[in-house]
Amino acid sequence: MDKKFAILFFCGFLTLSSHAQNFGGGVILGLSTSQVGGDNLAGFHKAGFLIGVFANKSISELLSFQMEMTFIQKGSNNPKMNDADHPNYLKEDISSSYIEIPLLLQYQQSSILKIEGGLLSAYLIDAYYNDLIGKIPIHTVNPFIKYDFGLLLGIDYTFSNKLSLNTRLSNSILPIGAEDYKHPNTYNSSRKGKYNSVLSFALHYNF
């Protein structure tokens, strides 16, 4: 049900952005690299896909507002899970996917470069831990909450009127683990909280 709702919402946003008057818009296609702060692993080792749509509007000669809706894969990856001599031996990593809505203010630094910052909200589609065998089934309480909220900064390099390359760093401002709120902390004994951190690279194509 969550996935069907996300697909319908995504299609609705695309239709709205393509018909809205006085707005620009387009599509987004790229890659995400991510980590989860507080999962006792480190490094942007998790690769995933990023796909979506955007709508934007000029506020002044140098400022514009942009709203996006994207499907993005996040999480963490433990490349040393099977290395018995490494401190990360047998430590679980995380796979997650979200529908994300970034709200951005963009500043036109030059004719080819924009600087951007903003807020994001995200709805969790799926998330789970992985061990050496694969996905760890969730038998009782889901270890992840349904929503993620964060801050982001980025730059947008313009190749042409139609195409630009966006590089962006985002980070959760609230923990994403359910055990950080109300349940025994099964996965994180240090109780540091878990936070998504994402470095993404995406092509933006303007209609």
Which residues make up each language-model segment?
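Residues that define the transmembrane beta-barrel architecture of outer-membrane proteins
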Residues: 23, 43-49, 95-99, 145-151, ...
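Outer-membrane beta-barrel strand-turn architecture
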Residues: 57-61, 107-111, 159-161, 207
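Membrane-embedded beta-strand positions in outer-membrane beta-barrel channels/transporters
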Residues: 50-54, 64, 100-102, 152, ...
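Membrane-embedded beta-strand positions of outer-membrane beta-barrel proteins
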Residues: 27-29, 67-69, 103, 117, ...
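Flexible, solvent-exposed loop segments that connect beta-strands
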Residues: 37-43, 73-97, 125-146, 176-193
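Transmembrane beta-strands of outer-membrane beta-barrel pores
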Residues: 31-35, 71-75, 121-125, 169-175, ...
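Outer-membrane beta-barrel "beta-signal"
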Residues: 24, 32, 157-163, 193-207
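Repeated loop/turn-to-beta-strand initiation elements of outer-membrane beta-barrel proteins
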Residues: 23, 62-65, 113-115, 161-167
